[in-house]
């Protein structure tokens, strides 16, 4: 799947979706926010309604021309992460995207419930919210409690409190020259 795409399902974690969108756009990255439903409105786990840029059915899920700089992004939150994982067309698109050389980024519960749906995870270093690591570990991935981890073509983040660190790791992949500029603009001295 071409481009930088954040996928939203009802019950997504507000900070994990919106901080990533904000940081990437501050870095000059064109981001698509995609609803997995047949409507643009998606409601967060805290009751905030977001209008997505497009719906999954309108997105080009093809893998032709996909590179590591094409990123599928999955925020956590409950029941949002379960809803993402239950969307089989999205999970199949993620598997095809990753197999074609694309990058997958997930935070909080999403590494455990979404990234774990990929096949080739042996030796992958990852982070996630506590108690969501077992499905990845069962596939040979190695948990670390870091705020954000970039391992191969998978980027993971620990929790809402580390959403900006997670977003900066994605930005570092896409345009490393913008990371310090964005950190400075956001007054991030220690992240």
Which functions belong to the PLM regions below?
Residues 34-55:
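N-terminal beta-loop-helix "entrance" segment that forms/cooperates
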Residues 2-8, 12, 26-35, 54, ...:
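Active-site-adjacent pocket-lining segments in enzyme domains
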Residues 19-20, 93:
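Hydrophobic residues within alpha-helices
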């Amino acid at each position: 799947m071409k481009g930088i795409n954040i996928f939203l399902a009802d019950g997504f974690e507000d900070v994990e979706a919106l901080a990533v969108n904000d940081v990437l756009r501050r870095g000059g990255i064109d981001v698509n926010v995609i609803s997995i439903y047949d409507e643009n409105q998606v409601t967060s786990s805290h009751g905030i309604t977001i209008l997505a840029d497009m719906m999954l059915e309108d997105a080009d899920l093809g893998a032709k021309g996909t590179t590591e700089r094409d990123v599928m992004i999955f925020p956590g939150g409950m029941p949002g992460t379960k809803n993402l994982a239950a969307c089989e067309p999205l999970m199949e698109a993620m598997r095809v995207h990753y197999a074609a050389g694309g990058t997958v980024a997930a935070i909080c519960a999403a590494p455990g419930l979404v990234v774990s749906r990929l096949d080739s995870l042996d030796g992958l270093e990852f982070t996630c919210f506590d108690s969501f690591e077992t499905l990845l570990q069962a596939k040979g991935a190695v948990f670390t409690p870091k705020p954000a981890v970039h391992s191969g073509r998978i980027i993971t983040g620990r929790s809402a409190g580390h959403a900006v660190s997670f977003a900066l790791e994605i930005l570092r992949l896409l345009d490393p020259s913008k990371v310090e500029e964005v950190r400075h603009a956001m007054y991030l001295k220690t992240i």
